[in-house]
Amino acid sequence: MLRQFIISTVGRRQPLLMILQSRLASNLDKTEYTTPGEIVDYDDPPHLPVPEYPVRPDEPLETRKQRLLYQSRKRGMLENDLLLSTFVAKYLKDFSAEQTAEYDQLINGVSNDWDIFYWATDTKPTPPQFDTEIMRLLKEHVKNHEKVQRIRQPDL
């Protein structure tokens, strides 16, 4: 029985090798379309409506800060989770009402979280409506002059 198994797997190895070689060859052809480090970013199609984020004018400051703490930790992409959660842990407690509103607009007014990441890391230019004091503070935080390891979110 073992001999039959060995023979049957040896017989199947050749087609598998051919499949792998053809896939590797097809992947090599794709390098001519993009350059290493290039950001492939497409505009959203017009048929995808982006829901408006609800404005909460009567929300108490402490409630808003708690909501922003939660939203900064649960972005849906690890890169922003780490950047924003460490930023909020360091600065949010000292934000005024105006600064808190700016931060709320920054993380909830943008339809694509990758935009926040690219702006914070200076990969793409920040649009004027989001180029605020809070964004400049976030950019400085991302530069990590203190060389702090940010491999996990801070404790609550």
From Swiss-Prot:
Keywords: Chaperone, Mitochondrion, Transit peptide. Residues 1-24 form a transit peptide. It is found in: Mitochondrion matrix. One of its GO terms (cellular component) is mitochondrion. Its main location: mitochondrion. Gene3D superfamilies: Flavinator of succinate dehydrogenase (1.10.150.250). It comes from the Eukaryota. One of its GO terms (biological process) is tricarboxylic acid cycle. Plays an essential role in the assembly of succinate dehydrogenase (SDH), an enzyme complex (also referred to as respiratory complex II) that is a component of both the tricarboxylic acid (TCA) cycle and the mitochondrial electron transport chain, and which couples the oxidation of succinate to fumarate with the reduction of ubiquinone (coenzyme Q) to ubiquinol. Required for flavinylation (covalent attachment of FAD) of the flavoprotein subunit of the SDH catalytic dimer. Belongs to the SDHAF2 family. This is Succinate dehydrogenase assembly factor 2-B, mitochondrial.
